[in-house]
């Protein structure tokens, strides 16, 4: 999407990267050692990997993933989302799962045990940020800015591989089943949000029709 394209473009333009690092106070020697998507890393290099796809074969399947950014051993991902998804942390487990699979695919590059999620809020409101009060211990405060970053713990490589194997085993067991015998997808698999059912009463049923 546009967000990822813009982020990739900003990192793969070497002049922009050098200028930004210098503005951030990096020494000229450090800036010179920054290498974007290097095929090999020499001593003293500071490798940064942007939008790289990797795949791995397991149990007859190919697992593939393309991360946004890996820097200093940490995987980073950009998310354009609503403020309430952030407040309620409704995608927390998905982010952990996604980051864990990236690490499983790239254990040589992703060496840290956390994923950094960089949020860009599509519905942020300064008025909401001033009045919102934290309602529950497991929720985040309404973000003070239109962007925010949060760190999440990753699974171990063993946990990730076990999850992948279990999912592949389930898929394999369904391959020969007739359509009517297949299990229905869960709400999570269908991306159905909780408590989103809405019912409306219309005094005039014709008002529900569209031209």
Where are these regions (language model features)?
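Metal-dependent nuclease catalytic cores that hydrolyze phosphodiester bonds in DNA/RNA
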Residues: 1-72, 86-88, 133-141
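Short beta-strand-loop-alpha-helix junction that forms the active-site gateway
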Residues: 78-90
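An active-site-proximal "capping" alpha-helix that borders the catalytic cofactor pocket
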Residues: 95-107
